[in-house]
């Protein structure tokens, strides 16, 4: 339904605690953030709260600096193990929120930093996916809003994430979350003098989360939409 109506984001009907802001700052103060995806932006950094390490590692504590998919670090799905990283020590309430959020098995769950003046160049995140017929120029892979969850812990003024084709901005405010079709060509810029702290969740979908998505769809677009998707 969302793809048919070119809906590329959906606000999650769930509260995010304010403490996530201070915990994101603590992750920054402790020096956990590392540069993320060289070439796609400037001032873009990340730290994994839940992630992976090589299977030979004693535990998953050091998984915080593996912020890309396993292949991006020269690893494979078969040679890594997943779990909470030592970032949990400075972000216990964020971890608790994630444990209570509807999920099955998480993959990467990462704090994301965009520094003052930082920018993320126009890109999409559906690499290796087939270009679909009759797709719009700004949505060449006809993705799904369930592709990723983007939580805005702290969103300064003069800061945006937007579609590259229409310049439509995601309506982030502090402690709001959105399902987000990352197959849309999008870009971001932080024109403020403050750090932007977001959090991205991959994996873990289950029936309870699908019910949450239906509830969120009804809240944003009205109950009639449920008749179209059921």
Identify the meaning behind each predicted range.
Residues 37-38, 49-55, 114, 154, ...:
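Structured loops at beta-to-helix junctions and adjacent beta-edge loops in soluble globular domains
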Residues 97-179:
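Catalytic core of non-heme Fe(II) oxygenases with the double-stranded beta-helix
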Residues 7-11, 146-148, 198:
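Intrinsic-disorder/low-complexity, polar/charged segments enriched in Ser/Thr/Lys/Arg/Asp/Glu/Gln
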Residues 10, 15, 19-22, 135, ...:
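Compositionally biased, intrinsically disordered low-complexity segments
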């Amino acid at each position: 339904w969302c793809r048919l109506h070119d809906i590329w984001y959906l606000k999650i009907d769930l509260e995010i605690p304010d403490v996530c802001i201070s915990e994101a700052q603590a992750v920054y103060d402790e020096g956990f953030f590392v540069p993320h995806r060289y070439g796609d932006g400037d001032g873009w950094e990340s730290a994994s709260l839940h992630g992976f390490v090589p299977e030979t590692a004693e535990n998953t504590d050091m998984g915080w600096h593996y912020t890309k998919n396993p292949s991006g670090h020269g690893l494979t799905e078969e040679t890594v193990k997943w779990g909470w990283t030592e970032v949990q020590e400075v972000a216990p309430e964020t971890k608790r929120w994630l444990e209570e959020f509807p999920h099955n098995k998480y993959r990467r769950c990462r704090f994301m930093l965009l520094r003052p003046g930082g920018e993320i160049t126009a890109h999409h995140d559906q690499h290796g996916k087939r270009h679909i017929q009759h797709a719009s120029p700004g949505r060449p892979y006809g993705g799904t809003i369930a592709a990723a969850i983007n939580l805005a812990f702290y969103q300064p003024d003069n800061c945006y994430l937007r579609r590259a084709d229409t310049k439509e901005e995601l309506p982030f405010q502090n402690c709001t979350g959105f399902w987000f079709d990352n197959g849309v060509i999008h870009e971001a810029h932080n024109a403020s003098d403050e750090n932007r702290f977001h959090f991205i969740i991959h994996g873990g979908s289950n029936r309870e989360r699908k019910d949450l998505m239906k509830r969120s769809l009804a809240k944003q677009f009205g109950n009639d939409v449920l008749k179209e998707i059921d």
